[in-house]
């Protein structure tokens, strides 16, 4: 049975941590975003207006390559969904940080690349797991992992950016319909440091996988 699971959620939600936990639990291959090897991301944080389109096209290419590899592996867990990159782009377009025409071009490109074609396996996941966190939890985890370009101590304006981002996530999750989905409460269930919370999260995911016939 092919089982492709993707994680989603804002910066600092714990996607990579849950990817590792879930991949070990299910005995599947884990795929990671590779933030530290992304040459565009630090540039984006310095000048979002200039680098939004470049960052999103870079990520689109990277994620499509990951999806193709994940399909070949048959069973996999990825720490970021290709669908939520458009959320960042839309937020920047709405706030005039990005050009609306660039956003439309990107969105059309994404839809064309994700379209199912005869004879090719579907690029859609079997399950999307969304980790909901509050701004407070988000900021604590961003500070803890210590990536310099993400810190509000370096750039205080990032706090407003993160707060705006959270406002886009809930509607995005509610409207997501490319696959079955489940929401994990990342505030209530600290699966990174609390083993009981981790067991509860894995139980919820296992139940969802059984419900959709993938376990």
Curated annotation (Swiss-Prot):
Binding positions for substrate per the UniProt entry? 33, 45, 56, 80, 85, 150
Name the active site residues.
79
CDD domains in alphabetical order: dNK (cd01673)
Among Gene3D superfamilies, the record links this protein to: P-loop containing nucleotide triphosphate hydrolases
Query: What InterPro entries does the record tag this protein with?
Result: DCK/DGK (IPR002624), Deoxyribonucleoside_kinase (IPR050566), DNK_dom (IPR031314), P-loop_NTPase (IPR027417)
Q: Which GO terms describe its molecular function?
A: ATP binding; deoxyadenosine kinase activity
Does this entry carry the keyword Transferase? yes
Top enzyme category: transferase
**Alphabetically ordered keywords of this record:** ATP-binding, Kinase, Nucleotide-binding, Transferase
Which superkingdom heads the taxonomic lineage of this protein's source? Bacteria
Describe, as the record does, how this protein assembles with itself and its partners. Answer: Heterodimer of a deoxyadenosine (DAK) and a deoxyguanosine kinase (DGK).
- Name assigned to this protein: Deoxyadenosine kinase
Organism expressing this protein natively: Lactobacillus acidophilus (strain ATCC 700396 / NCK56 / N2 / NCFM)
């Amino acid at each position: 049975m092919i089982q492709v699971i993707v994680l989603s959620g804002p910066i600092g939600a714990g996607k990579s941590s849950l990817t590792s936990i879930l991949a070990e639990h299910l005995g599947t291959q884990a795929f990671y975003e590779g933030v530290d090897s992304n040459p565009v991301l630090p540039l984006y944080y310095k000048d979002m207006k200039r680098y939004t389109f470049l960052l999103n096209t870079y990520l689109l290419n990277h994620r499509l390559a990951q999806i193709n590899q994940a399909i070949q592996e048959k069973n996999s867990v990825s720490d970021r969904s290709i669908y939520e990159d458009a959320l960042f782009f839309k937020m920047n377009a709405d706030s005039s940080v990005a050009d609306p025409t660039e956003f439309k071009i990107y969105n059309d490109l994404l839809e064309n690349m994700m379209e199912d074609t005869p004879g090719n396996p579907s690029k859609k996941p079997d399950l999307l797991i969304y980790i909901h966190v509050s701004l407070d939890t988000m900021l604590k985890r961003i500070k803890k992992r210590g990536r310099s370009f993400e810190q509000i101590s370096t750039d205080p304006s990032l706090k407003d950016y993160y707060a705006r981002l959270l406002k886009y996530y809930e509607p995005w999750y509610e409207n997501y319909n490319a696959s079955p989905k489940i929401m994990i409460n990342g505030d209530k269930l600290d699966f990174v440091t609390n083993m009981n919370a981790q067991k509860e999260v894995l139980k919820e995911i296992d139940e969802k996988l059984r419900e959709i016939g993938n376990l």
